[in-house]
Amino acid sequence: MHALIMQKVYSSGVWQFEGDVYVPWGTSGASVMQIFGANKPHASTVMLPVYDGKLTYYHNVTKVLADRVYDRWMRLNVVHDVAAGNVAVFVDGERRLDVQGHGGKEHYFKFGVYTQGLHNHSHRMEAHWKNVAIYTKP
């Protein structure tokens, strides 16, 4: 299980993460992206795991952002407005989620693949990323 961390820590402004992610069939119970940093009891503002071929929000397997995500490239955009305290998630250009963040003073983007042990996870943990970019509006 590997995850990349964008080393830029931010505490204000509007920040956008974008990239193309490919999740092979058989990967389940794996988070592919998160915005780290939040007030306790949370560790992250947003977490996007894949369960049974569905991109979900946190560990809520009923909060599906995209279905049939296996074996295809998917464009993911995540916009975090720190002052407003909200996050928008776009999948393939379509707005799929608007949520309040979980606070926190410092944040950073983390992406790749890492296990989430709250539901049965698969032995296969794999995700491929390309065209990753970070944008900011101070």
Tell where the protein language model's regions lie, with residue ranges.
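Short strand-turn-strand beta-turns centered on an Asx-Gly dipeptide
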Residues: F90-E94
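Short, aromatic/His-centered strand-loop micro-motif at the edge of beta-sheets
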Residues: K54-N77
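Flexible glycan-contacting loops in extracellular carbohydrate-active proteins
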Residues: V99-I134
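Short tryptophan-centered beta-strand motifs in secreted/extracellular beta-sheet-rich domains
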Residues: F17, R72-D81, V87-V89
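Surface-exposed coil/turn segments at beta-strand junctions on protein surfaces, enriched
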Residues: Y10-S12, V69-D71, G104
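Hydrophobic residues embedded in beta-strands of well-ordered beta-sheets
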Residues: G53-T56, G85-V87
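Short, isolated positions in well-ordered beta-strands
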Residues: V64, R96-L97
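Secretory/extracellular carbohydrate-interaction modules
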Residues: M1-K54, T136
